[in-house]
């Protein structure tokens, strides 16, 4: 009940400031560009949340309580799970979620295949940048790393991907894993070049993981350690437990960027925690308006 009241107040107070930015279809075969404008004269509302891993119950409740519209946009900071199994289960989930009355703007995480590798995605213009989309699911977009998007008049740079802390378990047990889960050198160069063109100034950063100096160390008990403690608490805690070999190169690179760019707010997911450290906002379960007055303080 309390959450419902909060969401209603959020919708009234923080309803957004600009009309929906619309989008254009870009044919992969060089055809004419068709423009589809959702603008009906009322402002779109922009929201943001963290990893979902195929669990969208909160999003469904949010859409129902807030009475969202297709023009409203929910940014998800990676690991949505839409391209996790690479089979019909993914299509079933996309079909179910595409029926929600909202547009999803998704970052690539590390627990899913990249859209460009799936083979069913085209490219479309959206809010000043390019996005991946599937014609069958026209309200589910994936951001392209290194693109700059304009939401409610404010520019955001997007960088997806991270290292999977359970990589060894995935490989041992045959669970889904992708070698290109982290941003590569080409992506990093593209991001740095775009930021330099903007004189290293951007309103916000949208990334899956966070800069190295902001790691939420309290979340770093390994997956195996957690599982062992749940099975046999005393025995597990008395032993020297498994410590994963974690590649922090993405976080280190983001840390270098964070030190040299001028930004107002930085949103990230990945760590399954709702927490703010300085201008870094980590998102998980919370669904909040993209812009709050205190973000500009």
Show where each model-derived region lies.
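Active-site-proximal loop/helix segment associated with metal-binding centers of metalloenzymes
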Residues: 153-249
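Core catalytic region of metal-dependent phosphoesterases/phosphodiesterases
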Residues: 31-36, 49, 54-151, 225, ...
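Active-site neighborhood of phospho(di)ester-bond hydrolases with catalytic His/Asp-centered motifs
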Residues: 48-50, 74-79, 104-111, 143-144, ...
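Beta-strand-turn-beta hairpins that frame and shape the catalytic cleft
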Residues: 36-47, 147-158, 204, 277-282
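Active-site environment of divalent metal-dependent phosphoester hydrolases
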Residues: 53-59, 81-86, 110-118, 147-149, ...
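Conserved beta-sheet core of the metallophosphoesterase superfamily
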Residues: 95, 103-107, 122-126, 214-297
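Feature marks short, highly hydrophobic, charge-poor N-terminal signal-anchor/signal peptide-like helices
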Residues: 1-11
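Single-pass alpha-helical transmembrane signal-anchor segments in small membrane proteins across taxa
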Residues: 9-21
């Amino acid at each position: 009940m309390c959450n419902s009241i909060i969401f209603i107040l959020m919708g009234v107070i923080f309803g957004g400031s600009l009309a929906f930015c619309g989008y254009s279809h870009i044919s992969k075969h060089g055809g004419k560009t068709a423009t589809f404008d959702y603008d009906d004269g009322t402002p779109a509302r922009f929201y943001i949340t963290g990893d979902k891993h195929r669990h969208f119950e909160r999003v469904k409740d949010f859409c129902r309580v807030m009475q969202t519209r297709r023009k409203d946009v929910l940014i998800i900071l990676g690991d949505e799970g839409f391209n996790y199994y690479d089979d019909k289960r993914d299509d079933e989930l996309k079909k179910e979620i595409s029926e929600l009355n909202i547009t999803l703007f998704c970052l690539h995480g590390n627990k899913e295949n990249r859209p460009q590798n799936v083979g069913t995605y085209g490219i479309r213009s959206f809010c000043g940048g390019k996005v991946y989309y599937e014609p069958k699911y026209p309200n589910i977009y994936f951001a392209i790393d290194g693109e700059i998007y304009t939401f409610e008049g404010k520019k955001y740079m997007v960088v997806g991907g991270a290292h999977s802390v359970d990589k060894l378990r995935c490989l041992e047990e045959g669970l889904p894993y992708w070698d290109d889960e982290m941003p590569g050198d080409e992506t990093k160069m593209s991001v740095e070049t775009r930021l330099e063109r903007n004189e290293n100034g951007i309103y916000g950063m949208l990334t899956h993981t966070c800069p190295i100096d902001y790691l939420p160390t309290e979340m770093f008990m390994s997956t195996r350690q957690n599982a062992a403690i749940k099975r046999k608490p005393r025995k597990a805690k008395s032993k020297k437990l498994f410590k994963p070999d974690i590649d922090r190169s993405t976080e280190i690179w983001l840390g270098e960027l964070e030190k040299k760019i001028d930004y107002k707010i930085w949103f990230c997911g990945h760590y399954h925690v709702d927490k703010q450290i300085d201008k870094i906002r980590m998102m998980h379960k919370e669904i909040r308006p993209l812009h709050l007055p205190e973000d500009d303080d």
